[in-house]
Amino acid sequence: MASTFYIVHHEFKAGKAEKWWETAYAAMSPGGGWDDAVAANKEKGFFNHSANAVTKTGPVYCFWEVKDGISAEEFQDFIDGPSGPGFGQDALMNICKPIDTSLMNGQTPYPPVFS
């Protein structure tokens, strides 16, 4: 069976955006641990293809791919948890919507990373 793709709608909780951006920029800077986190998440079956911020205070829309066999509930737990995009700060409200690729004749938003 194929991976599941999700669109995740992130809204910042009140007063949390500035600290979240500081943490995100630090993580993405050289030596910040970003590559290690991406590799660890991929090993767990989660891969973020893109993050798309509308404004600095949100919302942010992300495209995630989830390895076959991982439930929507497990994905939500990951997204809301310390290894997810909130960096353990409880900064985001996350709404995860699976993409029904059958509606587009199997077309996925990105080439799959999980076979």
Which stretches of residues belong to each language-model region?
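A common structural junction motif
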Residues: 79-90
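Short S/T/G/P-rich N-terminal loop/turn motif that feeds into the first structured element of a domain
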Residues: 1-59, 65-77, 95-115
